[in-house]
Amino acid sequence: LLTNILATHQVLEACQKNNVPILLTSTSEVYGVAEDEVWTEESKSLIGPTTKLRWSYAASKMIDEFIALSLFEEGKISPIIVRLFNTIGPNQLSQYGMVVPKFIEAALVDEDILIHGDGSQSRSFTWVDDVVNYLIKLAEIKAYGEIFNIGQTEEITIKELAELVISKTNSNSKIIYKSHEEVFGKAFEDPKRRTPDINKIIEFTGMKPTKKIDFMVENIIDFKKNS
């Protein structure tokens, strides 16, 4: 929490001092458990209570955004803010709980694939190359003072993701389920779905995401087999 807020504030102050623009990476977590069908940049945030400690990350990222935008309004810095939605790629580590590499690594050795909850929660995964291309384009067009969702609109449930991974790897893995409380304790809350509206970034950049989940999973499988 403090690392996100204090370190970001120091970077923003350095940008102000040296008159350097900044591209600030925020997160889809700032929307919390908002019930909108898809989340636009203007959707209201609905994060959980302070007793659910997992929301500290979302809260710290929201504060980062507030600081950056307040400094922009004062004419002190030139920020571009992006909210990333479940970025994945071939070299992503599973040790921090990233679901796609975690499932693939288990499937490649026929281990059980563990799903937290009932697997009906859905996510929208975005290929890392698409994310990088968006970041470069936003910096080039100098979209200062703006907030953008960066993500893919294609949804998949976590259960469907596990089944896709098993199919693509020809694995003998079984899917097992554990409740969020059993894995993380009572101080955890998980959004049921997380899908971005990306009309704004398409309008500003003229670009759409290029990769679908089948490609992403196949690419990561090939990478892990050969690394």
Regions found by a protein language model. Give the residues of each.
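Active-site "gating" loop of Rossmann-like NAD(P)-dependent oxidoreductase/epimerase domains
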Residues: 6, 16-17, 25-55, 70-75, ...
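C-terminal "lid/loop" region of Rossmann-like NAD(P)-dependent oxidoreductases
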Residues: 118, 147-148, 159-162, 170-193
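Active-site helix of classical SDR
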Residues: 56-60
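Non-catalytic, hydrophobic alpha-helical segments
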Residues: 131, 135, 150, 161, ...
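Conserved cofactor-binding/catalytic machinery of classical short-chain dehydrogenase/reductase
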Residues: 7-10, 21, 29, 45, ...
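Conserved C-terminal active-site "lid" loop/helix of NAD(P)H-dependent oxidoreductases
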Residues: 128, 182-208, 212
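Glycine/proline-rich active-site loop of Rossmann-fold NAD(P)-dependent oxidoreductases
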Residues: 35, 62, 75-78, 87-101, ...
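Amphipathic terminal alpha-helices
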Residues: 199, 211-227
